[in-house]
């Protein structure tokens, strides 16, 4: 098994800053935007984007935490640990996750969102898009496109959970 670091902490910070600038440029009314991080690492990325938006625009956008497990089609979990302190009906919700792969987690996140309200618009921001979609889902904001083979694995580490920021690719062969 071979592990290779492909994104270090500095590059990750730049990618998050780039996503933040794109959010500012593409959303005319930022006061209608709600950030929704997908547990676990997507929540921490959402908080960083929220912090950068505050630094750049002086806005304190609401942020929620989406638990996709109860909405997945490949597992059965009853407990839903979603935290959404704002009504998302009529809001522009930006889903935020660490890796976009098959699209199944995003589908589950959208199912969770519509159970909470009816957003005006839903868009997707991901740190890494690795390809290999099984569903017709694409990211609106991408930090890094990293094409992989289907046997490789992308591992995102964030300092809040893992003690460091980095993205690695693992080749099991």
From Swiss-Prot:
EC number: 2.4.2.9
Binding site for substrate: 40-41, 97-105, 130
Keywords of this entry: Glycosyltransferase, RNA-binding, Transcription, Transcription regulation, Transcription termination, Transferase
Any Gene Ontology biological process: DNA-templated transcription termination
Catalytic activity: UMP + diphosphate = 5-phospho-alpha-D-ribose 1-diphosphate + uracil
Annotated motif PRPP-binding, positions: 93-105
Gene Ontology MF terms: RNA binding; uracil phosphoribosyltransferase activity
Spans through the membrane: none
Cysteine pairs bridged by disulfides in the record: none
NCBIfam families referenced in this protein's UniProt entry, alphabetically: PRK05205.1-4, PRK05205.1-5
Family from the record: Belongs to the purine/pyrimidine phosphoribosyltransferase family. PyrR subfamily.
Protein's job: Regulates transcriptional attenuation of the pyrimidine nucleotide (pyr) operon by binding in a uridine-dependent manner to specific sites on pyr mRNA. This disrupts an antiterminator hairpin in the RNA and favors formation of a downstream transcription terminator, leading to a reduced expression of downstream genes.
Assembly: Homodimer and homohexamer; in equilibrium.
Entries under HAMAP family matching the protein: PyrR
Protein name per the record: Bifunctional protein PyrR
Species this protein is from: Streptococcus pyogenes serotype M18 (strain MGAS8232)
Gene: pyrR
